[in-house]
Every structure is written in C-alpha cells, then in structure tokens.
Amino acid sequence: MNATSVPPAEGSCPSNALITKQIIPMLYFVVFVAGILLNGMSGWVFFYVPSSKSFIVYLKNIVIADFLMSLTFPFKILGDLGLGLWQVKVFVCRVSAVLFYINMYVSIVFFGLIGFDRYYKIVKPLLTSFIQSISYSKLLSVLVWSLTLLIALPNMILTNRNVTEATRVKCMDLKSDLGLKWHKASSYIFVGIFWIVFLSLIIFYTAITKKIFKSHFKSRKNSVSVKKKSSRNIFSIMFVFFICFVPYHIARIPYTQSQTEAHYSCQSKQILFYVKEFSLLLSAANVCLDPIIYFFLCQPFREVLCKKLHIQLKTQHDSETSKIKRENIIQESTDTL
C-alpha cells in the first residue's frame, strides 16, 4: 500500500497514486483531445458566422475561452504525472492553473449574458434596442475579460516565492502571505459569481418558458413543436451547468479553506482534495459539451456546419414569414434560447 501513496500536489497528506498519477491524467488527456477537436471545429464554423446578433458575439467568446482552457490541460497532465522538469509544476502553479480558471469563469459569465439577452428579447422586447446592439455586446465582452483578468492575475503575480531545489512543488507553498489571502478572496469571488449566474439562468429561463408557452397557447400554432424545442434548448444549458459546474462550486469553498487554514485534519484534506480534483475534471469536461449547445442554441451555426459538411438541413416553418412581428420574435428566440 505504501508504494501506491504519494504526497498530493496540495498539502502534506498522502494520496493514492493510482488516482492522482494515472486515472485523473488519463481522463484529462481524453478531455484535452476532444476539447481541442470540438472547439477547433466550432471556431472554424463560427469564423463563417457573422456577428449579426449579440448572442452570437457571446457564443464566439465562449469558443475562445474553451479553446484556451483546453490548451492548459497538457501542463496539468505533465504536472500530475511528474514528467518533465520540476519547473513544469511551477509553471502550472503560477500560470496555467490561473489561465484555466480565467477561461472557465469567462465562459460561465457569457452563458449568463446569453440568458440575460434572451430574457430581454422575449420577455421585455421593448427594452432591447440598446442592450442587444452589437457594439454594446462587444463592449460588455471586453469588460468581462478585463474584470476576470483583474481578479485572477494577482494569483500569478503573488505566486512569487522562489524554488531552489528540484523537490515536489506545492502550489500553496509558492504563494506569499498576501498571495494566500488573495487566493482565498478570489476563490470566494468566483464562487459567488457562479452562483449568481446559475440562479439568474434559472430565473431567466423560467420566465422565457412561461412567455413562449403563453404566446403559443394563445395563437394555438405549432405549440407542441415550440414546447419541445424550447424545453430541449433550456434543458441542454441547465444540464451542462448543473453537471459540470455545481459539484465543483459546492466543493470549492471547503477545499480552499483546507488549503489556507490549519485546523483541518489530514483525512479531511485528503477527501476534499479528491472531491475537488474530480469535480474540477467535470468542469473541464464542459469544453466538450459546449459545442453541442452551440448546435442547439444557434441556428446560423447549424446552417454553416451542415453546409460545410454537405449535409442537407431541413428548413422549418417556411410559411411563417407572413406572421406578425411579435410571433417572429418568439419563434426566432425559441431557436436561440
């Protein structure tokens, strides 16, 4: 049993080498390959999709964030396996791990903005003129990236203690006293951002569903098809958020406390470490699921993808072009929830 235990990357308690040096790196490798391929393809497709609507601008930002996040996985794999120079682990602690979180939370916030965008287009259509303009969306995108970098970059700068020996590197040991405090504070901030976005999406999509169902119940046209489509789109987004992000954000706070506070037992630290590692893997797997959401969420994405793959895409509701403007808004929004 002693041969299968090694010190974990974070802390002095032993961990199972089968989990930390084989299972987790192998799963990250699978996610890395799938994420690069799927997001590379998504980026290629979106290159041909004009940024004609605000939600498309937000989706393109998510593609960029997911692709950049995928590029950090090889460094985590090498660090967990203990391959390469010890400087690789230092790079993971100082740079690639921070970039991972930056891109993860950028992606989360943009999905929140998409929900906000859809809510105002469907439920509050009279207020959409400025909020849904392309220039506003691009400005908001710059603000999201800037604020996320502002919160996260100090974690790079304050991970500044020197490593003089090629020993097992522990990320928390590289942080200054201020770095430890900022690590804890930024973790709380990002967890708070996630829960705000998650609860907002529940509110937005509940209101959207009620509005769509009520509008089509009154018109009594294609109500079954609309219900199925809107339910599918809403379910796909909330499913990804719940499966990929909720477990990690439940585990994040107690794990951060176990890193920065001394009263946790070795066994507690070990359990929280495993929970954090596997829940973080679920969050990383989000880069493989987002392209599926693009397909359901964005009709221009579907059209370009099918055109590039020479697949015949069925046209739907061709006869609906004569509907009144209100019905057109509801139908379009059903395709792009």
Curated annotation (Swiss-Prot):
The keyword Manganese does not apply. It is a multi-pass membrane protein. SUPFAM superfamilies: Family A G protein-coupled receptor-like (SSF81321). GO terms for biological process: G protein-coupled receptor signaling pathway. The keyword Chloroplast does not apply. Glycans are attached at residues 2, 162. The chain crosses the membrane at residues 29-49, 55-75, 96-116, 139-159, 188-208, 234-254, 278-298. Residues 50-54, 117-138, 209-233, 299-337 are cytoplasmic. Residues 1-28, 76-95, 160-187, 255-277 are extracellular. It is found in: Cell membrane. It holds the Pfam family 7tm_1. Disulfide bonds join 93-171. GO terms for cellular component: plasma membrane. Gene3D superfamilies: Rhodopsin 7-helix transmembrane proteins. Keywords: Cell membrane, Disulfide bond, G-protein coupled receptor, Glycoprotein, Membrane, Receptor, Transducer, Transmembrane, Transmembrane helix. GO terms for molecular function: G protein-coupled purinergic nucleotide receptor activity. Belongs to the G-protein coupled receptor 1 family. Receptor for UDP-glucose and other UDP-sugar coupled to G-proteins. Not activated by ATP, ADP, UTP or ATP. This is P2Y purinoceptor 14. It comes from Bos taurus.
